[in-house]
């Protein structure tokens, strides 16, 4: 058996591929984002303001409607000193771990210049633990990062229409589209009706054709001459400037308008009027548009808006604004000045439009502005540059954007999501403050009277409690915790929805390389929408995912590492990291595999600019824990990644014999280990305390004490337990693990056990992925786990008096109350079974039905004779175990309980679950199955030296599934077992077949890893040799004890009176329509009659038959099923009067009301 406390020396065994970079902290995405939100670095630079500071800046100052007073913000502070409870106390008491937010606010009066200053409490902000989680109402939660469409400009071609959208963070969506039939460009505001592009530009103030032409085209001067060649060259050109000539009266008059096409008779006119030069559009000029779309728009204007030529020959700004407003707000009268200001505010003021830091960055990058534009609103240049670029896309000079490219999708982490939530809450607060300003007395008013924190508190509570992105932490094991914090979700508010997301969004995209894992994603409707971050990826300041690369200069890999976003990466050739790189970084091959823009080729090392930092940079943490991943089919690798997260922590965990080197990092960053704060010497170790004397202590008393958590319940009811791994006298460094957590061993992740496997069918017990396992595995507790259930009860105040905890429970035998103390609470250490009382509690019964005799007795004997009901907390069905803890929260001791509750008692029951038939087990390669039989070890097939196998898997489960990694892992594991070696074989650099064969030879096994096996039952040799190895197997959180369920009678649905469904409701099975058909087919009339009536929903018949069974009398006839009554009531709901009569013509009552009416009728007829 694997010895506990054994030190493990892992050796690298693989292809010697250089790793240029250590793994970063794996939960940085959570911690850094929240620190930015809390502004821990206290940035005050205007351009860098984000998080809480930006929330205050966008809301304040708040001015009253008549502008006589204003609330001004000075600064905020987080009052860390007044945090009342620690993380553990918050968990026990069901509270939120948070810090009070206070803000210094001035109330400024304009007339008197008086300032009233106050430090105002603005609510509690939940704090993130150092593990990257939040504790909300006593439960650990994680805020998952969201991946969404980046603000900015997008050019697309959908359903045959070329369009572009400027997507803001907040504000009006501006779209442009090209009408291909008529070759016109249109603008759309918030997806309303179309507005001609040039009309929209005129509304913005570009009031003449000349101005509009200058935005899109370069111009050139042309001579007018009767020369034939020059004459013909001018035909078909377009005027860029108006042409004026002198009239007879000496006045200048416009002869031709800019935007007109030149015809031969125009040239004749010009020659006649002695015009020597004209300015025309140079379509082929640098930065000019080679398209007549804008000119077509001018022609369209003439048709649609026919101005009075005597006054003006083209639409004015006023005409354009009227046209725009007839689309935005049809039917609303608006003045010219208001319309102009409103349109300006719509795009160019920060109050109404915000493209965000990201949107601005994207626009600057797209349109190559010579000096970067600052600010987060649009500028006019953005609008016409977007139109120009769209026309270039249409004529094929530019390409459309790929919406799934990671340059167009960005990450919103906790901090940003929280900022958005608070901004909305603060704007509600602002509205309330404005209303109060106009209604309060100015003399006595204080800042506190104006600010209401209700919307802020409610928004925070709602976000953490109910948002789709705030999730109950997946805490089955450390890996599940870690991956949950690194998850990226495309769903949620402002994201996609499952039903509308197509294949393209879910697909693996070439930009995912090194940023998002192509393997780890759920199976089912969320596939591709929920993904994991790759190992080395990080999020940059704009929210885009970046991957690290090593710079390559002249075919030599330097040690310089650069992070590239998906947009930057598109420009370079990026080489693959391989074993052909020398110690000095020189690439010793003529050709290197590389990629650019999703194409994979081989080129000379001199031509590549960057190189991957590590082979495992393309996958996520879960996938990089699978050895020999490169030999598995991707679908099975996906299952393997997902199932490792479901592995239940075992009582005696063991790290994998064939690991990947990620086990240490994964356990370290998950936050389950206890790490030393300072270097020093261990002075004291017990099961729950470690004391370390630091090297650089202030004095002898300055010691670090660490308290370990014992037998804590996790969110998924597994056991969270820490145990020391250092001894007295050991020297430890700062950051070194000193205690293991759940599913870890010596600071390494240990999700399962290494067991001896044979791939051999055995009497059909491993048919269809079933697993045959040896009893030795159960006997030695190899796969035993502890599960902890929490049951709680409230002691309430009722209308008839308070409930009472007591061990004096009516009608209960002394024996059933043996384990309760004087207050009726079970003692710790008791073994309990279903139905046992955990907390004795009685509730007063209503006294309305008491007889006068009882009242007399009550008045004589007082409380004792009063009737009480037994409402004790009992062990639910299917639960048994040992009581390990009882926690009590009392109102009179200052605990915050819900209204009407005086005390809450929580009882924790721990159950030891051994492996049994029906439990789900799996390897790391997606090879899963159910335990079908546990065989005595003497009956298991055994090797020539007498060693029986631990587990038999079906060989047919390997070839069709194409997960050969399990075979290679088993071979190397077998050699490791014999040689007592532990291997580190990282993904994509795992040992070759020759290396594995060398190890097998060294261990004295055949290189095929096939040995002769004997049948345990007969002792005879199997016909063929059998493949034997050591495989790492996990027990998954799908335990048969949690799924098995039986019911005799139980709760019924109120309306239909049919049993409820499901184990959680202690439900039964419904005999539905199809089951009735089956019985009808057999003509089983009597069975059917009782199944449909008295065994099901005939309430009257049900109680009658029960009575007759108890009394031993013959059963009475059946009554009317409740479902029939439901049908009758539905018909009555349709205003159809529905009554039933028996053979004698008497009405049969269907409801209690019917009974009353029939009784009334009888009594009235009797009179």
UniProtKB/Swiss-Prot annotation:
The family line of this record is: Belongs to the RNA polymerase beta chain family.
Q: Does the keyword Transferase apply?
A: yes
Q: What keywords does the record list, in alphabetical order?
A: DNA-directed RNA polymerase, Nucleotidyltransferase, Transcription, Transferase
Q: Which organism is it from?
A: Treponema denticola (strain ATCC 35405 / DSM 14222 / CIP 103919 / JCM 8153 / KCTC 15104)
Catalytic reactions on record: RNA(n) + a ribonucleoside 5'-triphosphate = RNA(n+1) + diphosphate
What's this chain's function?
DNA-dependent RNA polymerase catalyzes the transcription of DNA into RNA using the four ribonucleoside triphosphates as substrates.
Give the matching InterPro entries: DNA-dir_RNA_pol_bsu_ext_1_sf (IPR042107), DNA-dir_RNA_pol_bsu_external_1 (IPR019462), DNA-dir_RNA_pol_su2 (IPR015712), DNA-dir_RNAP_su2_dom (IPR007120), DNA-dir_RNAP_su2_hyb_sf (IPR037033), RNA_pol_bsu_bac (IPR010243), RNA_pol_bsu_protrusion (IPR007644), RNA_pol_Rpb2_2 (IPR007642)
Gene Ontology biological-process annotations? DNA-templated transcription
Task: Name the cystine pairs.
Answer: none
Subunit structure, as described in the record: The RNAP catalytic core consists of 2 alpha, 1 beta, 1 beta' and 1 omega subunit. When a sigma factor is associated with the core the holoenzyme is formed, which can initiate transcription.
Check the record and name the Gene3D superfamilies matching this protein. Answer: 2.40.50.100, 2.40.50.150, 3.90.1100.10, DNA-directed RNA polymerase, beta subunit, external 1 domain (2.30.150.10), DNA-directed RNA polymerase, subunit 2, domain 6 (2.40.270.10), RNA polymerase alpha subunit dimerisation domain (3.90.1800.10), RNA polymerase Rpb2, domain 2 (3.90.1110.10)
Q: Name one GO molecular function term.
A: DNA binding
Asked whether the keyword S-adenosyl-L-methionine is assigned, the reply is: no
Which E.C. number(s) belong to this protein? 2.7.7.6
Q: What cellular component terms from Gene Ontology apply here?
A: DNA-directed RNA polymerase complex
Q: Say which domain of life the source belongs to.
A: Bacteria
- One short Pfam name that applies is RNA_pol_Rpb2_6
Task: Report what the protein is called.
Answer: DNA-directed RNA polymerase subunit beta
Coiled-coil positions: none
For this protein, the record's PANTHER family field holds: DNA-DIRECTED RNA POLYMERASE I SUBUNIT 2
